[in-house]
Every structure is written in C-alpha cells, then in structure tokens.
From Swiss-Prot:
EC number: 3.1.3.-
Entry's Gene Ontology BP terms: pyrimidine deoxyribonucleotide catabolic process
Active site: 9 (nucleophile), 11 (proton donor)
Reported cofactor(s): Mg(2+)
Protein name as annotated: Putative 5'(3')-deoxyribonucleotidase
Length: 180
C-alpha cells in the first residue's frame, strides 16, 4: 500500500516565527505589541510605520536559526513519519538569507526527518503531496491536494479551509483512525 504524503510549512506551523518577530520589533522600536493585538491581521498592517523594521529583522543572519518550536510539533511529526511520508515545505524565497538558518534549524529540531524531504520554495503549488498543513491562505488556495489551515493570529477569520488549532489537533486528524 502506498503511503500518503503530508507537506508541512515551517513558519508559524513548526516554528514560532511571529513570536520572535514581535519580540525583536518590540525591543528595537520600544513598542508593546502583543500577539492578541493582531486579531486576524498581519503584523505589518498593525504597525505599518515599522514595516521596514520587520523586513530588517527577517533578513538578519541567524534570525531563523533560533526560533522556538511550536508546542508538541516534534513529537507529533515523529509519529506522523511512522505512517506518512512527511515533507517540510517552506516558502523561503521572500527571505533568501533564511535558507541556511532554516536548514540548520530543521536538522537540529527534527533530526529524524530526511533532509531530502526539505523543500525550499516560493509558491507551494509545486508541492505534490496529499496534504498541506500551512497557516497561509494564499498557499492553501493554490495547493492541489487537501489543504489544512494551521491556526495563526493572522488567519483566525478565514473559514475557507479545514482547520487545526494545534499539533495535538494534527495528531488527532491524522493518527486517530490509523489501525493500531
């Protein structure tokens, strides 16, 4: 029997990228932005006067290397690999300086994944998997398999896709019906 495949986004799905951006922007611009303030918006729309600072933070060498892992992501992804072919599909083209950092981060925090399954791309319509778990509605719109939205503060008002709110939800979605 052929195993089904799952492509998983990195930023805001495996890694808490936005939390790190908010911390850096708050520190540098002496702001007090909280995650909850985004309420369905992207950070650049909440503080448009600091859009250049957001870009600067993202382009800093090492930024993507030190992100926190989302709760339960490691354990659930490891379990998924027992039943599915798992790929990491990260849209790295917007921040080309992120390639090495993202690669090293994945090797450190997900050492059980085959690096040949890391896909650095722009648009995820090139990814031919059965499922895509992503926080970005634009990527989910163009994906040809089954799109699954991972909840993030910027997408909470989007109801066009099946949704998972956490890695425990991902585990339930994919593993609860697997024959033991």
């Amino acid at each position: 029997m052929t195993r089904k495949s799952i492509a998983i986004d990195m930023d805001e799905v495996l890694a808490d990228t936005l939390g790190e951006i908010i911390d850096a922007v708050n520190f540098r611009a002496d702001l007090g932005i909280k995650m909850e303030a985004l309420n369905g918006q992207k950070l650049k729309h909440v503080i448009p006067e600091h859009d250049g600072l957001i870009t600067e933070v993202l382009r800093e060498p090492g930024f993507f290397r030190h992100l926190k892992v989302m709760p339960h992501a490691q354990e659930v992804v490891k379990k998924l690999t027992e039943h599915y072919d798992v790929y990491i599909a990260t849209a790295a083209m917007d921040v080309p300086t992120s390639f090495s950092d993202k690669y090293e981060w994945l090797l450190e925090f997900f050492p059980f994944l085959d690096p040949q399954h890391f896909v650095f791309c722009g648009r995820k319509n090139i990814v031919k998997a059965d499922y895509l778990i992503d926080d970005n509605p634009r990527q989910l719109e163009i994906f040809t398999g089954t799109p699954i939205m991972f909840t993030a503060v910027h997408n909470i008002n989007d109801d066009r896709f099946e949704r998972v709110n956490s890695w425990k939800d991902v585990e339930q979605y994919f593993l609860d019906n697997i024959e033991k």
